[in-house]
């Protein structure tokens, strides 16, 4: 309505109201109330309300409530509500709820809701949900159907909590389409969980543009996973500057991964200042990586005292490494009791080191139940030592599935010894070998050689030998010797012998003899005698005796 028309309408209302028209007084009072002219509005509203105008009684209640006259406001709202005003019933219900009079509040909110008042239906649903009343969903639905976006969001949350994601998605879409930022965020989460990343990104972006920092953070992670690190950093920075600690931590981790420690530290501090104790913990990790151990301990301690369970574990590790076992144990306990899987495992290690096997077993079992591969490995080793082979196999499988290369190797070895699951044994040897387990690499080499796959065998032996396995170096030497590559074979025999491999030393002694180098042969014999095992030492000793006699003749 144009300003001139508005002024003319107000003039007509004022003239009629001053002439005693209660309807005009009600409309004029409402107009003045909307403009914030409370002093001018009040007499018109009072006159109209006294004449039985229920809209005026409701608006008079609003005016008095704004001025802090809550008791008188309630009186006028009650009068209007009794006369059938749904807005007044809603307002009265809210005030009664805030005063703790929930039974009376429910009555008036129900009155408003039954008349189709969406705010009344929403407030009634809110009251019922607070009391865990299942009828809350009905009233949220009524409000949502009438266009109330917060009700649609709350209804979606209820359906999601009940496991009905399909209905939840429908209501999230309804609320998000009305620019509800949190609904757009939750819709994005649901879509991301089922792999619809493009649509999830659209809703995250809409939510972020409507001021939801968590959506900007989530969008950053989605972009990072798609390889768009620069775009991810922009959204994380926007979220971090809006106070999202998770985004600040992500930004810190991004810079830390690039080796930009100063920038990483800056954002970790922003996270900490936002109340996210991951910031303090990450500062500890950053300082530890830079060799600033004292500072690392301070940050771990700060995060640990704030209840960060992994910081408790990290602090305990620092204390244990410097010999303070009594100081470490309470922090391991706090970490474990708070749900840190590593804390539970480390507490098990601590008890095992003292010979307290029962306590160690309990903590290993707790960590293993949460998927800790090394904890499952410790349990499996103990079971195998007790002869509980079936149970040990199950635990080794759990350890291997949890990422333990040693668990995978031991599982394969046990299956190998049983001889009834060769394919599975091969699989787990391969898993361990691919993870860099040297003995598994040697076994893969041996198995390949046994089936005549010499190139594959050589590849596995080389990987293990180059990683420091003396058995692999010896086996590689044998393989090369059979392929007439004696010069390289000698290099690997020497590497194995220098690492204490008796058979390699004996092989070098025999090669030295064949070359007419008795002094060198004697030296290798002495080392083979020293290194063993027994049968090698015995052969080397006999050869050494013959060499000594020859050299002294």
Where do the model's predicted regions map?
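Terminal, low-structured helical/coil segments at or just beyond the last alpha-helical repeat
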Residues: 1-4, 527-553
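Residue-level detector of the short coil/turn that links helix A to helix B
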Residues: 36, 68, 100, 131-132, ...
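Conserved alpha-helical positions within TPR/SEL1-like repeat arrays
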Residues: 23-30, 55-62, 87-94, 119-126, ...
């Amino acid at each position: 309505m144009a300003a001139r028309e508005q002024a003319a309408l107000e003039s007509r209302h004022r003239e009629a109201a001053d002439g005693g028209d209660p309807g005009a007084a009600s409309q004029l009072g409402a107009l003045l109330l909307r403009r914030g002219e409370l002093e001018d509005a009040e007499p018109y509203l009072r006159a109209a309300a006294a004449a039985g105008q229920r809209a005026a009684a409701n608006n008079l209640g609003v005016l008095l409530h704004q001025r802090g006259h809550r008791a008188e406001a309630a009186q006028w709202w009650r009068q209007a509500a009794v006369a059938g005003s749904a807005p007044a019933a809603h307002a009265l219900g809210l005030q009664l709820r805030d005063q703790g009079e929930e039974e009376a509040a429910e009555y008036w909110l129900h009155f408003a809701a039954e008349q189709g008042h969406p705010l009344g239906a929403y407030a009634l649903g809110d009251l019922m949900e607070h009391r865990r009343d299942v009828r809350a969903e009905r009233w949220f639905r009524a409000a949502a159907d009438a266009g109330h976006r917060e009700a649609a969001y709350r209804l979606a949350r209820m359906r999601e909590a009940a496991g009905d994601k399909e209905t939840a998605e429908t209501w999230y879409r309804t609320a998000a389409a009305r620019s509800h930022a949190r609904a757009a965020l939750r819709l994005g989460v649901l879509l991301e969980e089922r792999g619809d990343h493009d649509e999830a990104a659209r809703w995250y972006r809409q939510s972020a543009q409507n001021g939801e920092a968590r959506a900007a953070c989530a969008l950053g992670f989605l972009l990072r996973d798609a390889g768009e690190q620069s775009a991810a950093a922009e959204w994380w920075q926007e979220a971090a500057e809006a106070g999202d600690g998770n985004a600040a931590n992500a930004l810190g981790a991004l810079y830390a991964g690039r080796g930009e420690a100063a920038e990483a530290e800056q954002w970790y501090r922003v996270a900490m200042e936002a109340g996210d104790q991951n910031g303090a913990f990450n500062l500890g990790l950053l300082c530890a990586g830079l060799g600033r151990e004292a500072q690392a301990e301070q940050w771990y301690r700060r995060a640990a005292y704030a209840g960060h369970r992994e910081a408790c574990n990290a602090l305990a590790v620092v204390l244990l490494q410097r010999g303070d076992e009594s100081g470490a144990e309470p922090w391991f306990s706090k970490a474990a009791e708070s749900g840190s899987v590593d804390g539970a495992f480390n507490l098990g290690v601590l008890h095992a080191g003292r010979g307290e096997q029962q306590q160690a077993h309990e903590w290993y079992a707790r960590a293993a139940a949460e998927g800790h591969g090394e904890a499952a490995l410790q349990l499996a080793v103990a079971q195998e030592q007790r002869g509980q082979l079936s149970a040990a196999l199950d635990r080794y499988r759990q350890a291997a599935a949890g990422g333990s290369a040693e668990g995978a190797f031991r599982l394969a070895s046990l299956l190998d010894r049983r001889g009834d699951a060769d394919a599975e044994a091969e699989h787990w040897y391969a898993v361990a070998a691919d993870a860099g387990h040297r003995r598994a690499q040697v076994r893969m080499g041996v198995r390949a050689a046994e089936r005549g796959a010499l190139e594959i065998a050589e590849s596995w032996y080389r990987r293990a030998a180059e990683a420091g396995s003396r058995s692999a170096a010896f086996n590689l030497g044998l393989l090369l010797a059979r392929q007439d590559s004696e010069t390289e074979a000698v290099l690997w025999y020497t590497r194995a012998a220098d690492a204490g491999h008796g058979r390699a030393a004996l092989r070098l002694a025999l090669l030295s003899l064949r070359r007419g180098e008795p002094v060198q042969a004697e030296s290798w014999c002495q080392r083979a005698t020293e290194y063993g095992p027994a049968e090698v030492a015995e052969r080397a000793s006999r050869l050494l005796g013959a060499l000594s006699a020859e050299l002294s003749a």
